[in-house]
Amino acid sequence: MSAAQIFNTVHVNGSSPYDVHIGSGLNELIVQRAAESGAEQVAILHQPSMDDIASELDAALVAAGLKVLHLNVPDAENGKSLEVAGQCWDELGGAAFGRRDIVIGLGGGAATDLAGFVAAAWMRGVRVIQVPTTLLAMVDAAVGGKTGINTAAGKNLVGAFHEPDAVFIDTERLATLPDAEIIAGSAEIIKTGFIADPEILRLYETDPAACLKKEVEGSHLPELIWRSVTVKGSVVGQDLKESSLREILNYGHTFAHAVELRENFRWRHGNAVAVGMMFIANLSHKLGLIDAPLLERHRSILAAIGLPTSYEGGAFDELYDGMTRDKKNRDGNIRFVALTAVGEVTRIEGPSKQDLQSAYEAISH
């Protein structure tokens, strides 16, 4: 293993505080954390694409005197099902996995979501260390304590709030990712820029290529990851269970989740969020909440790095049905997180179906 180097640490407050470590060569620190925890066993939950990384981590954990169990799950959103979670619990039971033991979620957002849910439910809650390997998971899924699985009714409708013991973001993993994964993950970073950190937007506007550069030297990605995690950590530290403030992290997500449901989760989450931000920006402009320059700023920033800014036409009824199922809805009203300016967040409650259709048509192709 290469020597560990930490660039930044974000401390997340709350009922169970934890640290998010951002750096390179972090396997050594992951092993140290597990070895000092009092655990006898570590279960690494990972997808086939992570087999090599999991094997490397396995060897280091065994060398530190820990027993290692592998929970192999299907790639992508296919693994986030009750059936797969049940198989994981069966394996934990067969290994006599105890309350002091630790689950490690290794992989993209689907793996970290599932690992958190498996850990939250096993013995009413065992510790989980999140090791995200995609940009999306680094800035979104692995931070914040939300866990969940998908059902036929929608995405992440079954889950639990379960804060991780620690999160380790290794920027060396970025170089292994396809360009499309970097682009899609950037949508969640841009989202945090619009809701809370204008410097994120400035970086994308002044040098979009550096914001996508996977090799750390000369890349803005380490700073963008740190800034995005800082925003999310501050929010969830004040409101873990999304009773008020945490809702702002759902900017663009109401429409995005409807798109994902319609696409049977085949769309990358970040791409759906990009289109979702364009939808809510258009709705906000129509309702007089934002001006035309801010609407155009959404489009230009997203388009500059290759994110989609439109969605296919003729699908409004299906998308409307998806939006009516959103978890943020209250009293039968569809609710949206919206902006009045960069860093100034508000809510739109129960907009008319006609206004929603108009916003949809503005982004249809």
Swiss-Prot record:
It catalyses: 7-phospho-2-dehydro-3-deoxy-D-arabino-heptonate = 3-dehydroquinate + phosphate. It is an enzyme of class 4 (lyase). GO terms for cellular component: cytoplasm. It is found in: Cytoplasm. NAD(+) binds at residues 75-80, 109-113, 133-134, 146, 155. Keywords: Amino-acid biosynthesis, Aromatic amino acid biosynthesis, Cobalt, Cytoplasm, Lyase, Metal-binding, NAD, Nucleotide-binding, Zinc. GO terms for molecular function: 3-dehydroquinate synthase activity; metal ion binding; nucleotide binding. InterPro entries: Dehydroquinate_synthase, DHQ_synth_AroB, DHQ_synth_fam, DHQS/DOIS_N, DHQS_C. Pathway: Metabolic intermediate biosynthesis; chorismate biosynthesis; chorismate from D-erythrose 4-phosphate and phosphoenolpyruvate: step 2/7. Zn(2+) binds at E188, H253, H269. It comes from the Bacteria. Its EC number is 4.2.3.4. The keyword tRNA processing does not apply. Its cofactor is Co(2+); Zn(2+); NAD(+). One of its GO terms (biological process) is aromatic amino acid family biosynthetic process. SUPFAM superfamilies: Dehydroquinate synthase-like (SSF56796). Its main location: cytoplasm. Catalyzes the conversion of 3-deoxy-D-arabino-heptulosonate 7-phosphate (DAHP) to dehydroquinate (DHQ). HAMAP family: DHQ_synthase (MF_00110). Belongs to the sugar phosphate cyclases superfamily. Dehydroquinate synthase family. This is 3-dehydroquinate synthase. The lineage of its organism: Bacteria, Bacillati, Actinomycetota, Actinomycetes, Mycobacteriales. The gene is aroB.
